Amino acid sequence: PSCIAYNNNQVYVGQGAKMLKSKLQPDQNIWFSFKMNLGKDNGPEFTRTELKEGNPLGKIENTLDATKLFFKKLKTEIDNYIQEQNLPRQLFYSVSIPASFEANQRADLKKALEFANIPINETLFIDEPNAAFLSYLVQANNNGFNNYNIPVDSPLHILVFDFGAGTCDISIIEIGKKAGKLYSKNIAISQFEQLGGDDIDRAIVKEILLPQLAKQNNISVEEIRENNYKKILLPKLQAVAEQLKIKVCKAVASNKVGQELPNLINSTERINFLQTIDFILPKQVMKFENPSISPKEFTDIMKKFTSETLAFNFQDDVESLKSIFTVINSALLKANIEKGDIDLVLLIGGSSYNPYIQTALYRHFDNSDIEIPQDLQSHVSNGTAINSFMANGLGVDIIKPIVSEPVFIILQNEVRKTVVYEGTEIPCKEILIEDLRPQRNDQKEIEIPICVSTKDKILTILKLKSEKGFSTTDKITLKCNISHDKLITFRAFIQNLEISTEPLNPFAN
């Protein structure tokens, strides 16, 4: 898991850090689901951090810091293992990331990897759903995928549903035959949305646990200050909500009949978290004894996350609430196919253990095969290792990656000019944007916003410079290259002479 902790003057990452979740304070000495905030330039985010500038172990003052330290610690552990096991020292890396990660997020991730001295190559990144599918392919003899026939004129469409703690990622993969050869490629990736199991936990806190806490302390919810809720109550209550969610899901799953949810989902019997929690607020101390939830209350919350008709799109810095079908529909729309065209739905990610999610997908994709592996959380890591072997060892790219969102420049009068269309296979040929002209004579700098998806998401601002000044007769050509890892570079020319370009810091998302 994307988790890093600081405890007893030691830094922990992954599962070791996650095990400390209930003992530590979020954004103070434990950080999780932080990768979703990469690509933002918010300055110092974690004002209460215990890892400040000057700490010999490193600093965590924002998301990029957390990511840098995460990979640095991971790299150290890998190097130690290689040395202990006396393995070859020449290493090649493959890193799995959310498929819907945009270029600015990938650029930040690359910075973190460079900080950790992890070597960068063209095939470093693989989208998590694609990695999961690679693992699934390798295990085809055990999971029945080898029973599929692939007609020449009718390729298979596989929808990989990757639902984790902080992400809901959809990748639609096409497998077909062309010129007697088998091919596989991405045809769509869902739009980036901040949706995951953590959002279910936050909904439990706000709708169930917060009213209980207020009642036990003889106050109203309205009397709880927003700042105290965000910084003190929510972090602790979210961990409790996660445990209650797991308890309800296990009870419901064990009583399922086929793929239908049991009558237990309407039960009002309380499921308890047997513990007393103290909250020290600036002006009072609050106690919370045995937080609880009923299956019916949890069912009401899950209806919102699995609604096919309601478009939940409420979002602020505390919570984001969307249905999983918001994400699914965005991928189907991009692929220009109907749900009935999907042959197989493959579930991946820890939050896919949720029986409400599974049942919702069975009902929605009623003409598709649904595959739920026993281990939902290992396929991504296994597939990433397979990708590293295939790409670094054999030079083979099994699934052709695509651009998930259009990239465009903004010209005079807010005119948009598309540079890269969504769905473009990458790496692609160099893209030329020709016949751009300065707006006035003697202009020494020209700024061109480069956007992804919408004009509100600025990837970077390209600054063109000329010491003698531009002329309105100058014909400017931009040359764009996009790598296998979806990282974009621009160069500018006037009459075949390259001119100085300088990217400004983006403020995306």
Q: What do the PLM-derived regions correspond to, one by one?
A:
Residues 1-116, 200-258:
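Phosphate-binding loop and its immediate beta->loop->alpha context
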Residues 1-5, 178-206, 498-509:
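Short glycine-rich, Thr/Ser-proximal phosphate-binding strand/loop in the N-terminal lobe
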Residues 35-41, 55-62, 196-359:
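Gly/charged contiguous loops adjacent to phosphate- or pyrophosphate-bearing nucleotide/cofactor binding elements
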Residues 43, 140-185, 347, 476-493:
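Gly/Thr-rich phosphate-binding beta-strand-loop-beta motif of the actin/hexokinase/Hsp70
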Residues 117-131, 358-385:
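Conserved phosphate-binding/catalytic loops in two-lobed NTP-binding clefts
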Residues 123-161, 379-396:
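Conserved phosphate-binding catalytic cores of ATP/NTP-utilizing and phosphoryl-transfer enzymes
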Residues 150-152, 214-239, 244, 251-253, ...:
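Acidic, glycine/GT-rich loop-and beta-edge segments that sit at the periphery of enzyme/chaperone cores
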Residues 184-194, 222-226, 367-372:
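Short beta-alpha connecting loops at secondary-structure transitions
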